Amino acid sequence: LKEMGIEVDDAPVEEKLPFKVEMPKELTTREAQEVLDTLIEKGYLDADYQPSKLTGWQRGVLAYEIGLYLGFRNIWVVMATLWKSNPGTLRAYYSKSFNEDKAIEYSKEIKMLIR
């Protein structure tokens, strides 16, 4: 981003939050921070890295796409830790997305943003 003339805050993610969030180590990389910041900018996450007005299945798809892109070994645990959620619930939300007509388009939308 710096190469494109966009100002980048180099402070660690944890220092930018107004409250203490348990930030999984998988999300402390520069690449992960850029993904999270993009999702905040586009309104998918709030300033505290929490889902912003998303349905359950949208949270599941978002968690899956973030984890897949960043190569997490355990997507559900990492994202549930950040979002103060239960890994099993988050995974169930993702499974529920298979019943949603809009899920494929939503998944494509997320992929376009984070890649």
Regions found by a protein language model. Name each.
Residues 1-115:
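Flexible coil/loop and intrinsically disordered linker positions at secondary-structure junctions
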